């Protein structure tokens, strides 16, 4: 009986702990959704209030590595200057896990698609992406963007114009 009681108590504690992390995941997911909505409305200054000063962020471009808050702010401003009608459509939001233990930690991640219009040419764009968000004290402290930034930018370059040389008769 004593062993059964211990098992029941341990099980109840495990459920209580996981429910707490699930509530944290739900809260953080809502914050990440709000952050993306601000990106859609091009409200960079309000987006910046979601970011911790100690932010570390996986940047999406080849060779960019890990950026800090200034690099992320510059990227946000660049996207908002270069693209109109930005809309993120999530396929699904998933709970994140502690990278060392594999235990849910309240972080959130999402797979989805960004659509927008490139300002310079009016070209419509659709970009599949993955984003992760870790929070500390209600602010985004760590995470990243994973998508084909180079491919996206290459798709926006106009196709070369073929020049046909003709002979002139004099």
Regions found by a protein language model. Give the residues of each.
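C-terminal and inter-domain tail/linker signature
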Residues: 17-170
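Sec-dependent N-terminal signal peptides
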Residues: 4-14
């Amino acid at each position: 009986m004593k062993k059964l009681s211990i098992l029941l108590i341990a099980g109840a504690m495990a459920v209580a702990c996981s429910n707490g992390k699930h509530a944290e995941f739900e809260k953080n997911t809502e914050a990440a959704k709000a952050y993306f909505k601000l990106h859609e409305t091009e409200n960079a200054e309000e987006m910046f209030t979601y970011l911790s000063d100690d932010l570390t962020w996986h940047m999406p471009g080849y060779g960019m590595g890990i950026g800090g808050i200034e690099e992320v702010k510059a990227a946000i401003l660049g996207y908002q200057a270069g693209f109109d009608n930005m809309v993120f459509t999530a396929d699904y939001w998933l709970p994140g896990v502690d990278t060392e233990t594999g235990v849910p930690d309240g972080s959130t991640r999402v797979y989805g698609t960004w659509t927008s219009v490139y300002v310079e040419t009016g070209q419509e764009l659709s970009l599949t992406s993955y984003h992760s968000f870790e929070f500390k004290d209600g602010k985004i402290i760590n995470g990243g963007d994973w998508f084909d930034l180079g491919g996206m930018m290459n798709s926006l370059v106009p196709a070369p114009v073929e020049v046909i040389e003709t002979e002139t008769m004099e």
